[in-house]
Amino acid sequence: MAAYKLELSNQAERVIRRMAEREPALYQRVAGALDDLRRDPHQGKPLKGELRGRYSYRVGSYRIVYLVRRQELLVLVIDIGHRRDIYR
């Protein structure tokens, strides 16, 4: 299976930068998870309702919400956040 290209939304980039500065251990775990998603983007949980078509991937109590564009071999990370806030 070919590796997918990973692209971050502006929101996801802001979260990653802030996380790298304030919570380096969590940043390392999220960076590892993003690499896993690049290799196999379908390991996340498909979302329902208004978020249909998107996936969620768990990193402890944090979630990575993303889209998979199979035609382009692209994983588009929409947002990263704590599970209590991410789906709002």
Identify the residue ranges that each predicted region occupies.
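Basic, Lys/Arg-enriched alpha-helical interface segments
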Residues: 1-61, 69-74, 78-80, 85-88
